[in-house]
Amino acid sequence: MAVTVGIVIGAGILRTPGIIAGHLGNPWIILAAWFFGGVVVALSTLVLAEMAAALPEAGGKYVYARHAWGDTMGFLAGWSELLVSRGFSGAAKAVAIAEYLRILTGDRGSIRLFALAVCVAFFFLHTRGLEASTQFQNVTTAIKVLVVIAIAGAGLWAGDLVGFQPSVTSASGPTAGLLGFALAYQSISFAYYGWEDAAKMAAEVKNPGSALPKILVGGSLAVMVLYLLMNVAFLSALTPEEMAGSDLVARDAIAAVFGGTAGTVVVVASLLILVSSLNVNFLGLPRVAYGLSQHGLAPEAFSKVDAQGTPRNALYFISLWIALLALSGAFELLIRFMMTVAITVDTMVLMGYFKLRRSQPDLERPFTMPGHPLLPAITIALYIGILAILIWTQWQLALGAGAMIGAILLAGWITTRRATGAAADTTHGR
C-alpha cells in the first residue's frame, strides 16, 4: 500500500486542482470526479495485476501487450510509455517546477528557461549514477507524503468550508457538460497515473491471491482518500472560483488561513514533492529505453552502460526529449496530450486481459481478477466510454494523439518485420 502511495502522489495533486475546479465549478462535482478517478484506478490495477502475476517479466505493459496482441502492439506499449506517458509527464513536471521557481523569484524570469534549467540539472544528477539518484529519491519520497498530509490537515483544521457555502454550490465551470468532464478527467487521471507501476509488484508478492487485492485496492483507495482530503482542505479555504485562478492551490489555501509566510513554506515544500516526482522520470526512463533495446525494439546504442551503471546514451536521448517538450511551457496541454495517448494505449493493454484468458487458458495465474468477467468488462467499458468522450469533445487533440500512435505503430511494424526477416535469414543460413 505504501509503495502505491509513494509512486502515485506527485505533481498531479499540486498542480491540477485549480485546472479541475475551473472546468467543473461545483465543489461536490469536483469531489465526485476525484472519487470516480480513484474507482477507475482501483479496478484498472486489479485487471493489470492478473497479467503481471501471470507474466512476471521485466517490461510492464510492453510484456502484457506483446503476449496478448503480438510484437507490434508490444512496441506501441513500450514506446508510448517512453515518449508520451513518461516523456510528456516529465516535461509537465519540469514546467510545474519552473512555475513554482518563478513564484519564489517574484514572478521574474521565463518559465521556459527555468524548465530547461531544471532538465539540465536533472541530467547532470543522473550522470553521477544510480546510487546518487536513488538516495535522492528515497529522501524526497518520505518528505512528500508528510507534506501532503500536513497540507491536508492544516487546511481541514483551520478552514471554514468557504468553498461549500450555498452561494457557490450552484456555480458552473466555464466548460460545463461533456467537454468540462473530459478536460477535468485528463487532469485527474494524470494525478493518479503511476498506478500501473504498482501493479508490477504482482510477480513479487507472496500469496498473491489473498494479498494483492488488499495491496492494490488498498493503495489506490489510500491515494483517493488523500486526494479527497486535499480537495476538501482546499475548498475549506477557497471557493471553486478562487481555486480556478490558481496555479498552486495548496499555497493559496494555506496562505488564506495562515498568512503569506505559510504560503511560501508550502511553495518550498511543494517544490520538494515535484523534484521527487520528476526524479522518478529521469531514474526510470533511460532504463525503459535500455530494456527496449535489449529486446531489439530500440537502437542498440541505448543498451550501452557506463562505469556507473547508467545507460548513458539512453539518458542523453531522454533528457533531450523531456527538455524539448518542456520548452513549450504549456503544462495543461502536455498532460492533456499525454493522457489522451495513455488512455488509448491502456485500453488496448487492458483488453489484453480477455485475449489472454481466451488464447492462454492454461497459463498459471497466481492472482485472478475478482468478479470475472463482470468487473473487468466494466473497467474496459469505462475506458472505452472515456476515450469516446475525449475524442468527441477534443477532436483536434485526438487527431494529434492518433497521429503519434499511428507513427509508433508504423515504426513497430517495420521494426518487428525486420526482426522477423533477420531471424528467418539466420535460420536458413544454418
Where are these regions (language model features)?
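Hydrophobic transmembrane alpha-helices that form the core helical bundles
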Residues: I19-G22, V41-C119, F123-T127, S270-G291, ...
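Membrane-interface loop-to-helix entry segments
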Residues: A98, I111-L161, L216-S220, M338-M348, ...
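Hydrophobic alpha-helical segments of multi-pass membrane transport proteins
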Residues: V148-I151, M338-R365, Y383, M404-A423
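Transmembrane helix-loop junctions in multi-pass membrane proteins
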Residues: I13-I19, K93, L125-E131, L161, ...
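Helix-loop-helix junctions that connect adjacent transmembrane segments
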Residues: P27, L31, R108-S110, N138-V267
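TM-loop-TM module centered on a large, flexible mid-protein loop between adjacent transmembrane helices
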Residues: V63-Y64, G70, R102-G106, A171, ...
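C-terminal membrane-solvent junction of multi-pass transporters and transport-like membrane proteins
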Residues: A301-R312, D346-L397, G429-R430
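Membrane-interface "cap" regions at the ends of multi-pass membrane proteins
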Residues: M1-G18, G22-W28, V41-L46, E57-A58, ...
